[in-house]
Amino acid sequence: MKVLYGTPEFMAPEVVSFEPVSFSTDMWSVGVICYILLSGESPFQGDTDMETLSNVTAARWDFEEETFSEISQQAKDFISQLLQKDPRRRLPSAGALLHPWLQHSQPSSSKVLSKERIRQFLARRKWQKTGKALLALKRLT
């Protein structure tokens, strides 16, 4: 199946490229969600949807030192295995459930996730949606 539907920063590269989608497409989105939950930032979000889609297509992302310095190596490995550009190289759902990061019963860090970063992330998305709505209205008039 081929589709182009979704929120740009959560789309897998194969969706942007109109290539067939599969379960591994959803695993990409799980990687994006984990990145956001741990950092309060999107790995691919640009200033515009086109910039975001370009970042996704190139699989251009990294673990910023300031944000991820206290995040475990296992968590970063989990995300890295999910954000593979090639869907065949992505961690499948069964492998994800067996990943050491999810198998650990005790958190290895006492770091508190930044509520402010999450708020900023959500506020930015809200403004971008408002801008898109205004552009759509402008096209109708």
Q: Predicted regions: what is each one?
A:
Residues 2-11:
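Conserved activation segment of eukaryotic-like protein kinases, specifically the C-terminal portion
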Residues 15-24:
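Conserved end of the kinase activation segment
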Residues 39-42:
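Structural helix C-cap motif within protein kinase domains
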Residues 70-82:
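Conserved C-terminal C-lobe helix
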Residues 83-95:
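A conserved short helix/loop substructure at the end of the activation segment
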Residues 94-141:
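C-terminal regulatory tails of eukaryotic serine/threonine kinases
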